[in-house]
Amino acid sequence: MENKKIETIKDAQKLVKFFAERNNWKDIPNVDKFDHLHEELIEMSQHLRYKSEEERIKFVKENKEIFTDGIGDLFFGTCRLANQLGVDIEEAFNLVKTEILAKYNHKNPENNLIKKK
């Protein structure tokens, strides 16, 4: 299972569950997993902080591996957290997608972007 390409969110969550069981880790709620995910986000955001839009785009293009690795770590950790909480990620996504798409179905820009001077 470890060398098989993961093609669905459900398969990813199953692989992470298998990984945890193989290592004798309990799937119980763990505050450390929330902290781990927060750290992963901070690590990636630090590369883009205080840069203009143009600088951020350039940095990501030139350093794609940083973000590919970070997103992979974040997703693996999210699967682990979902397992600990007994949440099916696909069900959770489908539960919120319509509401989020409707809520942000407007032309306003995203928040917290550095504005050009």
Where are these regions (language model features)?
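Flexible "arm" and connector segments at domain edges
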Residues: 1-71, 75-117
